Amino acid sequence: MRIIVDAMGGDNAPESAVWGGALAAKEYGEEVLLVGKPEIVANVLKEKGLSDVKGITIMPANDLVDMHDDPATVLRRKPDSSMAVAFKLLKAGEGDALVSAGNTGALLTGATLYGGRIKGIRRGALAPVMPCANGQVMLCDAGANTECTAEMLLQFAFLASLYAEKINGVVKPRVGLVNNGTEDTKGDPLRKEAYALLKKAGDEGRLNFVGNVEGSMVPLGACDVAVCDGFTGNVQLKTIEGVAKFMSKEIKGVFMASVGTKLGYLLCKKGMDDFREVFNQDKIGGAPFLGIAKPVIKAHGSSNEIAVMNAVRRAIAYTKSGMIDAVKENIQYMTVE
C-alpha cells in the first residue's frame, strides 16, 4: 500500500508533514510518497534522522497551495503545487490514499475532481471525529457543503455510519439529526424532510436512527454520528473547540490564583493531564472526505508530526476497510427518486 502525503501543506509544513509521514512509514510498514520540493523534504528527513527509513519516496513538486489561495481555481493555476501533484498521483493509481493538512477547500475540490465521487453520491462531506461524554462522535458534514438537500443529509448519515462502523469499530452507530429540538415536528423544511427520510431508513433497519438531537446533546454522547449541513456542522465544531479552549484557560486561571491553589494543582495534575488528553486531536489525526471514490484524509492545518502520522494511520485503515465498496453496495438506499 502507498499513502501519498502532501509534504508542503499545513501551517507547520514541511517539517511536520515530512516528519509525520516518515514516522508513519517506519511505524506502520507501508510505503509513503512525500510530495514536495525534493531538497527541502530530504533536508527535513536528514535533520530528523529518518533518511534511511524504508518505504519513503520523494515525489517532486516545486510549488505549494497556501491557505489564502482560491480553492476553486488554485489546482489549475498551480499545477506543480504539492497538492495538485499529489492528486494527480492518486488519480493515476500511484498511491492508494492521500493525506494533507493544506487548504480545506482546495483539498475538497481536488478530491472531487481527481478522486471522483462514488456513483450516486451527490456531494462529498467532511466528517471529523470529536470527543464526547462516552467516547467519540462523528460530525457529518462539518463544512464542505453549506447548502444541502434532504437527500444529501440522508447520504451523509449512511456514509458516516459506515465509516464509524468499519473504521472506528462502532457497533450499530446511533445516528442523530442535529436540530433545534428533539421533537419530530421541529426544524425548518429541510430538517423535517431529512427527518422523514432518516426515519424511513431506520424503520427499514438500514440505519440506527435515534431522532433529532440538539447541539448541546452532541458532546454529551447522544449519538455516534451527528448529521447536519456543512454550515451547521462547522459552527458546531468551532463552538466545541472554543468551549474546550475557554475551559482550559479558566481552569488554569483558577489554579494559578494563589499559592494554595497552585499546591492544589500539583495534587490533581494527573487528572488535569487526563482531562486535556480528551481534547487532544493529535491522536485522531484527521478527518475523511466521505463519498469520494478514493480515500482522502484532511489533517488539521496546525497538525504536528504526531497528528500527521495518525492521519496516515487513518488513511491506511480507510483503504483496508472496504468501506468504499460498502457504500456502492448500499447506494440504492441513499437515493431519493
Report residues per predicted region.
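N-terminal phosphate-binding or glycine-rich loops at protein starts, especially the Walker A/P-loop
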Residues: 1-42
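Phosphate/nucleotide-donor binding subsite
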Residues: 49-95
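Short, glycine-rich nucleotide/cofactor-binding loops
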Residues: 3-15, 144-154, 298-303
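Short glycine/serine/threonine-rich phosphate/pyrophosphate-binding segments
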Residues: 12-17, 80-93, 97-111, 118, ...
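Glycine-rich phosphate/diphosphate-binding loop of Rossmann-like nucleotide-binding domains
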Residues: 15-16, 28-33, 38-39, 146-215, ...
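Glycine-rich phosphate/nucleotide-binding loop
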Residues: 112-126, 131-139, 222-226, 230-337
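Glycine-rich phosphate-binding loop
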Residues: 89-108, 186, 191-193, 197, ...
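Short beta-strand segments
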Residues: 6, 35-36, 59, 100-102, ...
